[in-house]
């Protein structure tokens, strides 16, 4: 049985540090395209980037997005290193960033992340709520939960909270959504 938990560390990054980290990240070239539906498409809901040991330029027709080397983002690398004090294996983690470039237009609908067991996130920039909803047989069950995240907040999502099992329709699954109302409404 999987248990769901969500941990928030309010104001984990100080005001000056989060501003510097935001500047480091916003200055990167984010993926605004992806290979989906058998073709390259423009991404309107949000932009993404991956972070790992070495850089990779995007090759969208072959399904590969941009990867930024940890050494190219020293402030983000420092966060990853500091997490290793609390989380086993954090030094071996790859990273993914979501860039909600316009909080009035961007977001992601209720979903689970079947490809990962845990999410560790730092909210930067404007405040943005994260929503959770239980589902059974692809239908929402119960009351939607809203968690407000402010710039500098660190959050950790367990395997159940990430929604790793979201494709299993016959059990209760937890899904999450973020962004503007278009993506988070019932």
Q: Model segments located where?
A:
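Non-heme Fe(II) oxygenase metal-center motifs and adjacent flexible, charged/small-residue loops
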Residues: 1-186
